[in-house]
Amino acid sequence: MPIISLPADPTSPSQSLTPFPIQLDTKDGKAGKLLKQIRIRYLNEPNSRHTPITFINTYGFVYARDTSGGIHSEISSDLAAGSITACMMKLGPGPNIQNANLVLRSLNEFYVKVKKTSSQREEAVFELVNIPTLLREHALCKRKMLVCSAEKFLKNPSKLQAGFEYVYIPTFVSITYSPRNLNYQVARPILKFRSRFVYSIHLELILRLLCKSDSPLMKSYNADRTGRGCLASVWIHVCNILKNKSIKQQGRESYFIAKCMSMQLQVSIADLWGPTIIIKSLGHIPKTALPFFSKDGIACHPLQDVSPNLAKSLWSVGCEIESAKLILQESDLNELMGHQDLITDKIAIRSGQRTFERSKFSPFKKYASIPNLEAIN
């Protein structure tokens, strides 16, 4: 089974995201207070004349709130001691922000209420009651409300109970400067489409989670024999290709490899809508596969939509793309089980964008409180 395996280069700025180190405020002599921090990454070309857009994600904690009312902040007495659970809230794409440090400062103005509800499954509702002026043009801030799967954005949604009011307090913010053409996600109906007239091409990534040997994640994923964390497999639906006469002439395997080589696919990872896999085609895209890519040959796949548990693991640890493979399968489920998968390594791991740097923020730990941003100054 062909596998691409690349060595890590943590010294290269383009191959990592700066981690969120645990920094404690010790001015009052108390331990366990986290300072707010920012992580910045640039995906746009350094000398590009085009103005980039910014993707902003926040990571923090949900707290229970005293229902007696009143204005609160992260140091307010109406918040119950200790967080309920960790949380991620994506603000999505927005305009260029010239001074990224202003984003960190603006977190003090955030007031986000959290509520749990249910339809077909449990859902989390985030209401942005107070939005910093700097961030009002970002996607979520325009809508002022996010209704999403509770499993995707709350570390442990089962801890939220009826009869309580909850607020979300962001602690860490990730801002990614990127070209405008990265603002593209494949529509769900296209990803779910199956037919006996097409083959499905899938991408399997083996991600190395850079956790310690005593991490709880070691029980959830395969241990790496080299001792560098653990390994996780994640599959992504890349595209469909039409079954035609060329298959009979070339053979199924030769046809598959030829299509993969002609597309010249590259894969990378970045913090866009949370941890996101980016697939880019540098070559010819077959007509049947065109709906899976933007006009620039790009497709972004947020990991929380593909594998929520794996995405939440990356809130606290980094990862490396250890290997990448393309798999050809029958699209129709009735034919899928009766045919063997074809596997090839005709996909490149994009140089400089194969590592998702670990964060020292850990959703497995509780912290007493979070200091006001003024403590940073």
From Swiss-Prot:
GO cellular component: viral envelope
Any Gene Ontology biological process: virion assembly
One Gene Ontology molecular-function label: structural constituent of virion
Keyword Nucleotide-binding: no
Keywords, comma-separated and alphabetical: Viral envelope protein, Viral matrix protein, Virion
Pfam families given in the database record: Matrix_Paramyxo_C, Matrix_Paramyxo_N
Cell location: Virion
Family affiliation: Belongs to the morbillivirus/respirovirus/rubulavirus M protein family.
Summary of the function given for this chain in its UniProt record: The M protein has a crucial role in virus assembly and interacts with the RNP complex as well as with the viral membrane.
Protein name per the record: Matrix protein
Native source organism of the sequence: Human parainfluenza 2 virus (strain Toshiba) (HPIV-2)
